[in-house]
Each structure stands twice: as structure tokens, then as C-alpha cells.
Amino acid sequence: MKYDIIGDIHGCYDELLQLLKRLGYSMINNIPTHPNGRSIAFVGDAMDRGPNSLKTTELMFRLQDEGKLIYSPGNHCNKLYRYLKGNKIQLQYGIETTVAELDLLSNQDRIYFIKRYIEFYDALRLYYSLDDGKLIIAHAGIRENLIGTSYSNKLRSFVLYGDVTGETLPDGRPLRRDWAKQYNGEAFIVYGHTPVEDARFVHNTVNIDTGCVFGGKLTAVRYPEKEIVSIPSLQPFIADRFTRFP
């Protein structure tokens, strides 16, 4: 099977449609379909911050309904899940934009979306191992010694948030270790979560979160080709939201 794995979308629905078209997909019955039978996959965080979180998430619902969804949920997916289940959540760091979209829905449509999103999230795997273990899709990455282990808080934390140090940056974001530099595994790991200006290949990993919602690009990596395909963002560029590694 050949895959086109798409980075963090964050509500940038128009850019997603452009990228799918660039990759050769057509919308058939509202489902992205490739003439050569390729499959799309996602590193998560379809929602929050951008202009069209609900449209983007509803596309994931349709893919799931068709049995065609490969989607590693990210920290924003998890936060929205907890909020919609009634947990007390601070409406900041992006979720407030999705909540604002929800508030514009009719009561009936809002109730339906909440129910459908909870079902959507409950059905997801934390990360995906494909092509007989040669390909791993995990939102913020995964350390080699965690691959194939049973569910744990350590595994969940790493896949959702990355290799956090416990310290924070001045803007409140967590400080993370560059885990990919230490990775020596055989599986090719595709991840996102940390915005970089260009897809970043390190050892046998690639970060494809190229900060579309911050004015960068929406990026896909084709597997097994390891070819990068990107679409420029339609959003304003915010330079300080991108991580630059030494």
C-alpha cells in the first residue's frame, strides 16, 4: 500500500483541499479518492486555530464512516474530546476558535457534532503501525523503546505532546527535547506537532508539521517514496511560532 501522510491541518480546510488535489486526489461522494489506489493518512490536529475546524473534522468523520481513516490524534484532538465530554478546559491555545464555530451551530447540529466527535475519537488508535511495521504515524513522534508496548500514560504523553522536559517557554508552550536525534529504529516515523519551516528529516524520521496555520505550508510525505509535497498557506505568517533546531 502507498500512503500520502498529511501534517497538522489546524482548520486550514482550503489548503487541505489544494494539497489533496496536488497529490492527485479527487472528491468522489465527498471522499478524497486517488486513481492509483493510494491512501491518505494524518498526523492529527485537524482542528483549532484555523478558520475551518468543523469542516476539516467532518471530512475525517466521512473518511472514518467509509473505513478509510488513518489518523493519529494529537493534543488538540484530545483537548477537544475532553471539553466535549464536559471536562473543565481552559479555552486558550487554539481550542477557543473551534468552540466559537460550535457556538454558531443550531442546538441540534451542535448536539450531533459533539456525539459524533466523541465516537470519532474513541475509535482512533493512539498511533499507527503500517506496512508490516516499517511505517509509524504518531502525532508528536514515538521513542523506539515505546513502539509496540502496551498502553501507558508514558506512551500517551509522548505521542500527544512529544518528549517534554517539564519546563516551559516564555509564551507558555512546553520545552521539548529533540527526540528524533536519538532515534535509531528501523521503522520510518512520520510525525508533526512542532512547527518547522520545512519538512525535517532526521535519522529515519520526518516532521511534516510545516505550520500551515501560522502562514507556513501544508505538507504531505509520500510513502514509500519519501517525497515531500507542499502547498503554501493562506494564513498570515507568524515567524516566532516555528522551531529552528541547531
Residue ranges and their predicted role:
Residues 1-4, 129-136:
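Beta-strand-turn-beta hairpins that frame and shape the catalytic cleft
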Residues 1-57:
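N-terminal active-site segment of His-dependent metallophosphoesterases
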Residues 5, 40-42, 71-72, 136, ...:
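Residue-level marker for buried hydrophobic side chains located in beta-strands
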Residues 8, 45, 60, 74-75, ...:
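Divalent metal-coordination and catalytic microenvironments
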Residues 12-14, 48-51, 78-81, 144-145, ...:
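Active-site environment of divalent metal-dependent phosphoester hydrolases
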Residues 34-37, 49-129, 133, 157-158, ...:
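Active-site neighborhood of divalent metal-dependent phosphoester bond hydrolases
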Residues 135-155:
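Divalent-metal (often Zn2+) His-rich catalytic cores of metallo-beta-lactamase-fold enzymes
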Residues 157-246:
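Acidic, His/Gly-rich catalytic cores of divalent-metal-dependent hydrolytic chemistry
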